[in-house]
């Protein structure tokens, strides 16, 4: 039996189809920075920037790119849902750097 809390979490996952995010890695004279902008809808936007040396997100970004490519080629709903969950976990790893 599925608990109400689990059901609610599943529903929230379903509604996250239209989240857009932009991740920028840059360099300034005093160090590296990572900027993220997330648009949940037209009215709700989150932006955050952190400054740090040696920001290591290359693996996560490569994994997101691979997941996106695989998602486009898969036509089976169950496989697409599994890829979506993996992509959300990878995005969560990236967001953990920002302390959201």
Swiss-Prot record:
Q: Which cysteines are joined by disulfide bonds?
A: none
Give TM regions: none
Q: Which domain of life is it from?
A: Viruses
| Pfam families per UniProt | DUF5517 (PF17639)
Which InterPro entries is this protein grouped with? DUF5517
Question: Its biological function?
Answer: This protein may be involved in virus assembly.
Q: What is this protein called?
A: Uncharacterized protein A-100
């Amino acid at each position: 039996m599925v608990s109400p809390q689990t059901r609610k979490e599943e529903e929230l996952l379903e509604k996250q189809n239209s989240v857009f995010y932009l991740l920028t890695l840059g360099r300034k004279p005093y160090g590296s920075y990572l900027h993220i902008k997330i648009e949940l809808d037209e009215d709700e936007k989150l932006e955050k920037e952190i400054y740090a040396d040696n920001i290591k997100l290359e693996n996560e970004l490569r994994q997101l790119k691979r997941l996106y490519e695989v998602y486009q080629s898969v036509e089976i709903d169950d496989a697409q849902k599994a890829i979506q969950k993996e992509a959300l976990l990878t995005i969560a790893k990236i967001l953990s750097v920002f302390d959201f």
